[in-house]
């Protein structure tokens, strides 16, 4: 699902600037590696579980609504090109 050099557009975030940058970098890598949304989400989730301790949840897609409970300072919703990424920690 190569997004070329798509710019990240952060729509909503409750997360440190450093962690936001990490989320965008991680998502960029995932989009370069995988074509299937489920695989992209799994890659991001596993990376964040490893780097920032479990339990992270990730949703990737072009069209979805959401309403989630998350831990303070552990939420980001952003676009890379046409693809939306919701990443949050809960549990």
Curated annotation (Swiss-Prot):
Oligomeric and partner information: Consists of at least 3 heavy chains (alpha, beta and gamma), 2 intermediate chains and 8 light chains.
Gene Ontology CC annotations of this record: axoneme; ciliary plasm; dynein complex; microtubule; motile cilium
Protein name, as recorded: Dynein 8 kDa light chain, flagellar outer arm
Keywords on record: Cell projection, Cilium, Cytoplasm, Cytoskeleton, Dynein, Flagellum, Microtubule, Motor protein
GO biological process entries: microtubule-based process; motile cilium assembly
Pfam families: Dynein_light
Homology family: Belongs to the dynein light chain family.
Transmembrane segments: none
Gene3D superfamilies attached to this UniProt entry: Protein Inhibitor Of Neuronal Nitric Oxide Synthase (3.30.740.10)
CDD domains reported in the protein's UniProt record: DLC-like_DYNLL1_DYNLL2
Keyword Cytoplasm belongs to the record: yes
Subcellular location: Cytoplasm, Cytoskeleton, Flagellum axoneme
